[in-house]
């Protein structure tokens, strides 16, 4: 009986740990920058892409496998909220592989579409994403 309980506990632990990693695939992206007058530009048109994204909450790391791999270490979970369009968002602070700080948001619209926003002080980009696993 003890062995059965131990096996069940190990299986449950593995399931819980595994559930903390989410896999996405970005299908398009857009960006905007701060112009020379200090104002944000409009978002660019969407550009197609095929970029895997892994959100590993066990290790507090988000990795975006674009042409240049982007690694974001989550430093603080800010909040989870419903935005004015009815979508739900999770927002957190991060430090990237170049030690720059920013804010990342995972947004899930009411219709199920999802985006990942990466915001710095002078540039921000957004990926349209789908869960891949």
Language-model features, listed with the residues they occupy:
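N-terminal glycine/threonine-rich, aromatic-flanked beta-hairpin/loop signature
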Residues: 44-74, 115-119
């Amino acid at each position: 009986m003890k062995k059965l309980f131990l096996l069940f506990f190990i299986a449950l632990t593995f399931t819980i740990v595994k559930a903390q990693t989410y896999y996405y695939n970005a299908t398009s992206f857009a960006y905007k920058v701060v112009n020379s007058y200090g104002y944000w530009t409009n978002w660019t048109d969407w550009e197609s892409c095929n970029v895997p994204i892994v959100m590993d909450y066990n290790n507090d790391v988000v990795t975006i496998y674009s042409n240049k791999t982007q690694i974001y270490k989550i430093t603080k979970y800010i909040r989870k909220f419903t935005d004015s369009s009815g979508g739900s968002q999770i927002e957190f602070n991060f430090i990237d592989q170049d030690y720059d700080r920013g804010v990342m948001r995972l947004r899930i619209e009411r219709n199920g579409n999802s985006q990942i926003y990466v915001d710095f002080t002078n540039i921000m980009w957004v990926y349209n994403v789908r869960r891949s696993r």
